[in-house]
C-alpha cells in the first residue's frame, strides 16, 4: 500500500514500504563555486567518503529504523523543541546527528538543539523506502520509483547556501529516469537491502508492524562537524508533479525546516 504522497515519499506495508577555491583547515573545508557558496568551517562529506567509517547504506538503514520507531508525539516537532531522530534524550554519543524527514513536515518548524563540535549532521532532503511487505522483487528500484516529479531542495548553513538539489523524472533514452539539473554537495543513495523493524505505534500511517527486508533511495546532505558556536541550518523541499507519465499519483509537497544549533567544544 502506498502512503499518501501529499505528505510522504516513503512507501511500504502490505503494499509499497546535495571563483573556485578550497582552503583546507583542520577538519574543515571552505568551498566556493559559481552560484553556491559555503560558510566558514562547513564541510560536506562526498559520495566517495564513509562518514565516520560507516557506509551510506548503513546510515540509511540506521536512519529509517530510528525514524520509523518514533511514535506520532516523538516525531512531531514542538515549538522550541529539539527533534533529533537518533536521540530522544541525549545525542552526545552519536557521531552523526539525524535531522527530521521533510516528507512528514506540513508546517515550517524551528528546532533548538545543542550538539558537539565532534558530531556530523544528516539532513534528509527527499527519501523513500520499500520493504518485503510489498510484492516487488527489486526493493531498491521500488523505492526509487516512489520519488517522482520535479524534486528541488536547498540547504543553508548560517544563511549561506551550501547544497542544492534539482532533479526531474523524465523520459531519458526511451525510459523513465532522473534528469539531473543540480546535485551539488548532495548524496544520492540507493541502498542495499537492510533489516527494517516497524513498531505498532509508528508515526508513519498505513504500516504493518513487523521486521522486514527493505531498501532506500533518495537524496541526503551529510555535513561534517561544525565549529563551536551558534549556527543555523535550513533545508527545504519542493516536489511538484510533472505529468501523468512521469509522476503518477504525485501531489505537490513543500516543507521548510530550521535548526538553531548551539555547538559546544
Regions found by a protein language model. Give the residues of each.
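Beta-strand-connecting loops/turns
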Residues: 118, 228-229
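Extracellular-facing segments of soluble proteins and assemblies that are Gly/Ser/Thr-biased and enriched
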Residues: 95-198
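N-terminal segment immediately downstream of the Sec signal-peptide cleavage site
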Residues: 40-96, 253-255, 261-265
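Extended, well-structured beta-strand/loop surface patches
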Residues: 152-228, 236-264
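Bacterial N-terminal signal peptides
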Residues: 19-35
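N-terminal secretory signal peptides that target proteins for export/translocation
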Residues: 1-13
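Short, hydrophobic alpha-helical membrane anchors of single-pass surface/secreted proteins
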Residues: 14-18
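A short tyrosine-centered beta-strand micro-motif
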Residues: 123, 231-235
Amino acid at each position: 500500500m502506498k502512503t499518501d504522497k501529499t505528505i510522504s515519499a516513503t512507501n511500504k506495508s502490505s503494499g509499497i514500504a546535495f571563483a573556485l577555491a578550497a582552503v583546507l583547515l583542520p577538519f574543515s573545508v571552505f568551498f566556493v563555486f559559481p552560484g553556491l557558496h559555503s560558510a566558514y568551517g562547513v564541510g560536506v562529506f562526498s559520495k566517495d567518503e564513509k562518514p565516520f567509517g560507516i557506509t551510506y547504506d548503513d546510515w540509511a538503514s540506521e536512519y529509517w529504523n530510528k525514524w520509523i520507531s518514533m511514535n506520532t508525539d516523538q516525531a512531531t516537532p514542538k515549538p522550541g523543541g529539539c527533534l533529533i531522530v537518533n536521540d530522544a534524550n541525549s545525542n552526545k554519543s552519536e557521531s552523526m546527528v539525524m535531522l527530521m524527514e521533510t516528507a512528514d513536515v506540513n508546517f515550517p518548524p524551528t528546532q533548538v538543539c545543542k550538539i558537539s563540535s565532534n558530531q556530523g549532521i544528516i539532513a534528509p532532503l527527499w527519501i523513500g523506502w520499500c520493504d518485503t511487505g510489498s510484492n516487488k522483487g527489486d526493493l531498491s528500484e521500488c523505492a526509487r520509483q516512489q520519488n517522482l516529479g520535479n524534486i528541488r531542495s536547498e540547504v543553508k548553513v548560517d544563511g549561506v547556501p551550501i547544497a542544492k538539489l534539482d532533479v526531474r523524472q523524465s523520459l531519458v533514452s526511451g525510459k523513465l529516469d532522473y534528469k539531473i539539473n543540480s546535485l551539488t554537495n548532495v548524496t544520492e543513495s540507493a541502498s542495499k537491502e537492510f533489516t527494517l523493524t516497524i513498531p505498532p505505534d509508528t508515526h508513519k500511517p498505513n504500516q504493518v508492524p513487523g521486521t522486514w527486508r527493505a531498501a532506500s533511495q533518495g537524496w541526503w546532505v551529510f555535513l561534517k562537524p561544525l565549529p563551536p558556536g551558534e549556527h543555523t541550518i535550513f533545508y527545504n523541499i519542493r516536489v511538484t508533479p510533472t505529468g501523468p507519465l512521469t509522476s503518477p499519483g504525485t501531489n505537490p509537497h513543500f516543507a521548510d525546516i530550521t535548526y538553531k544549533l548551539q555547538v559546544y567544544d
